[in-house]
Amino acid sequence: MGISLRLAEQFSAEEDGGGGGGNLVFSPLSIYSALSVVTAGARGTTLTELLAALGAPSRDALAKNAAEIARALAGGTATGGPRVAHACGLWHERTRSLKLAFRDAAAASFNAATRAVDFLANPEEARKEINSWVAAATENLIDTILPPGSVSTDTGLVVTSAIYFNGTWQTPFRKQDTKKDKFHLLDGHGTVDADFMRTGEDQYIAAHDGFKVLKMPYAHDHAAPQPSPRYYSMYILLPDERDGLSSLEDRMAAAGGGGGGEGFLSEHMPVRRVEVGEFRIPRFKLSFSRSVVRALRGVGVNAVFDRAELPDMIEGEPLRVSDVLHKAVIEVNEEGTEAAAATAVLMEGAARYAPPPPPREDFVADHPFAFFVVEESSGAVLFAGHVVDPTKS
């Protein structure tokens, strides 16, 4: 999903007039899934721009990758892993049928459910129905994705993508060890008192030039029968410098020749546990809610909003995308992580060698850092963001 880090860069640039001064959480996977469904009905420049942003050479390759991610994300609860639910929906005006090839492609690659609603006569009721679907898909962490007035009698189709994640750490932190400490804000703006989780257990840590990476695996039952392993981890990328977050994120986004920087993450992942010295990371709870059109334009997606070529989606007048709305929430604490996200695309007319033990590593996340929640086998980035003030949501 090459779009992940380039979107993070765009969102950061939007904060504080380009100062990047706010916390951030979003779901690359939710946005990727929703845009992939739109791509299944696109042609011409619209198709070219969407494929480039999503990092796919063709529509078939994109559909194949989406199907592989869907298989990798099949709920892990039965195998002792995190609970993961991912769903897509197509909500079309009931007087306009979806084209059969588009409907079948969306169902085959994205498991997208199709529902006919009455945008023309009762757009408010349709909005409530879509919001109820999102609330159910996200365990009510996100109770609404479409605000009042977002759909109208002109709405022809809404594409939704929702994800829910709930995982416990492989080694949970002890609550009694959590204590207040200073977290340093950006640009010398002082400190805040934050709740820091602590442990003396060995950790997956890798030290690189200018930053460190911490991997925190989620619990998984290795003995449980399953067709393929599903492993989830959170990665925290901590710059050495207290004000180093922006340059680190620029470095990540630039990696891979515009491919989005996921290669940067995979190349710097820790591979073994090391003894820790001083270790503490803050608890945090973040949320995000906005239109992501500006960010998508920033990564080269323009035609779909202007002269959209989307003739393969629905009968009658071709559509254009009028808005893309995204919401995300995440909470990280001693037990693990609970997170959810939803995206709505609104469209209307128009081992034998044993090396010596590595040195002991400190990992003190007392200044701004980036984080990712990743499914290891597919590399899918479920959630991404950064923390600049863990006391604010």
Swiss-Prot record:
Any one GO cellular component localisation term in the record: extracellular space
Site (Reactive bond): 350-351
Gene3D superfamilies to which the protein is assigned, alphabetical: 6.20.40.10, Alpha-1-antitrypsin, domain 1 (2.30.39.10), Antithrombin, subunit I, domain 2 (3.30.497.10), Serpins superfamily (2.10.310.10)
One of the record's GO molecular function terms: serine-type endopeptidase inhibitor activity
Key words, A-Z: Protease inhibitor, Serine protease inhibitor
PANTHER family linked: SERINE PROTEASE INHIBITOR, SERPIN (PTHR11461), SERPIN-Z8-RELATED (PTHR11461:SF209)
Protein name: Putative serpin-Z6A
Organism this protein belongs to: Oryza sativa subsp. japonica
